[in-house]
Design a protein with these regions (language model features):
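A cross-kingdom C-terminal cell-surface attachment/processing module
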Residues: 411-433
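Short glycine/acidic-rich loop motifs that flank beta-strands on beta-rich extracellular proteins
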Residues: 58-60, 78-82, 104, 108-113, ...
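Acidic Gly/Asp/Thr-rich repetitive segments characteristic of extracellular carbohydrate-active
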Residues: 25-52
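Sec-dependent signal peptide cleavage junction
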Residues: 18-28, 404-411
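Secondary-structure capping and domain/repeat boundary segments
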Residues: 310-390
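Extracellular beta-strand-rich solenoid/capping regions of secreted or surface-exposed proteins
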Residues: 43, 56-68, 76-97, 101-104, ...
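C-terminal low-complexity, Ser/Thr- and acidic/Pro-rich disordered "stalk" regions positioned immediately N-terminal
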Residues: 378-408
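Right-handed parallel beta-helix
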Residues: 71-74, 91-132, 140, 144-145, ...
Length: 435
């Protein structure tokens, strides 16, 4: 009995210790000054940081570990030049525990980044904010030499091998002369955005995001009112400019963005790298989209709402020729269309979907869609069977047969139609016309 009691006491103590340790680990380190924030980022024991007030920083914050930063509704602003945050290694997760806090910005127009103006700003932003970044030039060595990223990453710069996860908060009013006004993702960098907003940011290309690594946009991510101001060969994508691996899904939205290249106000996607693959599975794009298929088959589309059209995205439309229901059109690129449920039509049998109105060329649902197409339903008249309970002489009138008029017959002779029916015993019976 004593042993059992002692075991229970020890178990309780152990649970208390583990609970206390877990609580201590999960409690964020509170910061309200640049010094406190810089110190917390440099402390390897600190894995979670929470702002307790607005903080102005004079230099770029450098992340070299796995850490969560909670903006907590406050403003993190760089007063000097450079990126607000540079993720050198590890993973930075951005969250915001006070999304109802309100801040004001002024939109000066002419493709300029929004400016923090808490007194008279007309652009209202809900939640914590990262702002003021102007980008920088970064150099990295790899197996083939040195890579130079010029004047990029106004808000957050994601270095090769580093990761950025954005679940909440806002990146607003950041800029870069070359690329990635809001976020710059470098070769082998990784960016996942499932929440929060990137807005009022500008760059030569990729006003909101410039991706040369792997970027995933999903759920409630929003990119709005960003602009690509450059006119060079690589200056595309007011909202997003992607050259490598991009996945877009869920209810994410890109809206109100502009670009000097008017084909890509919302987004520009190409796959210039040999291993690059991009997939558009959802999202809403309120602005022109340009998918550059010069690298054949590397960009696929299976969903999404393209409000202002999209170059490189094709539509499969269905014409049921009187049948119901009418299937919804499908957005596709380099993927097969999904065969809809067969429509129905009174008095007819559905044969299949065809690419021409005359219904002579059947459509192959296993082949990838590489152009817009309208598919037509083909119908054949359903066979008719007649039954007459009386005994009538069949005149075998050939003209009547051609018109398809019903035949009467002796009920003892069976059905007048060459058909086969299986009895419950599996025996085949053939109905014949009586002579």
């Amino acid at each position: 009995m004593k042993r059992r009691f002692l075991a229970l006491v020890l178990a309780g103590c152990l649970a208390a210790v583990l609970s206390t340790a877990a609580w201590a680990t999960e409690t964020p380190t509170s910061v309200s000054t640049e010094m406190e924030l810089t110190t917390a980022l440099g402390d390897t024991a600190v894995t979670s940081i929470q702002l307790k007030g607005n903080i102005d920083i004079s230099n770029t914050l450098v992340v070299t570990k796995d850490v969560t930063l909670d903006l907590n509704g406050f403003v993190l602003k760089i007063t000097g030049s450079g990126s607000v945050i540079k993720i050198e290694s590890g993973t930075l997760t951005l969250v915001d525990s006070n999304p109802s806090a309100e801040h004001k910005f002024t939109n000066d127009g002419n493709d300029k980044p929004w400016r923090l103006d808490e007194t008279a700003g007309a652009e209202k932003v809900k939640g914590g904010v990262i702002t003021g970044g102007t980008g920088n030039t970064y150099k990295y060595n790899n197996d083939i030499g040195q890579i130079v990223y010029n004047d990029c990453g106004g808000g957050v710069f994601v270095a090769p091998g580093a990761s950025f996860i954005m679940e909440g908060g806002n990146i607003v009013g950041c800029s870069a002369g070359k690329s990635g006004g809001g976020v710059k993702v470098t070769n082998d960098g990784d960016f996942k955005m499932s929440g929060g907003t990137i807005s009022g940011c500008t760059a030569g290309g990729g006003g909101g995001i410039d991706n040369r690594g792997t970027t995933t946009l999903s759920d409630n991510a929003k990119i709005k009112s960003c602009s690509a101001t450059g006119t060079g060969r690589d200056d595309h994508g007011g909202g997003v400019c992607s050259y490598r691996n991009l996945t877009v899904s869920g209810s994410m939205v890109i809206s109100g963005c502009t670009a000097q290249n008017n084909k890509s106000y919302a987004m520009y996607v190409t796959t210039g790298y040999p291993d690059a693959r991009s997939s558009i599975e959802g999202g809403t794009f309120d602005g022109s989209v340009w998918l550059d298929h010069s690298s054949s088959g590397k960009i696929t589309v299976s969903g999404g709402t393209f409000k202002n059209g999209a170059s490189g995205v094709w539509t499969v439309t269905f014409n049921t020729n009187g049948g119901t229901p009418e299937p919804e059109s499908q957005i596709r690129a380099n993927l097969p269309a999904t065969k809809p449920d067969d429509p129905t039509r009174s008095g007819y049998v559905f044969v299949g979907w065809y690419t021409d109105e005359a219904c002579t060329a059947a459509y192959d649902f296993t082949k990838p869609v590489t152009d817009s197409v309208t598919l037509y339903a083909k119908w054949e008249a359903a066979p008719r069977y007649y039954y007459n309970s009386g005994t009538t002489t069949d005149t075998d009138n050939a003209d009547e047969d051609k018109k398809g008029s019903p035949k009467t017959f002796d009920p003892g002779a069976g059905i007048y139609a060459v058909s086969v029916a299986l009895s419950l015993t599996g025996t085949a019976w053939i109905g014949r016309k009586r002579h």
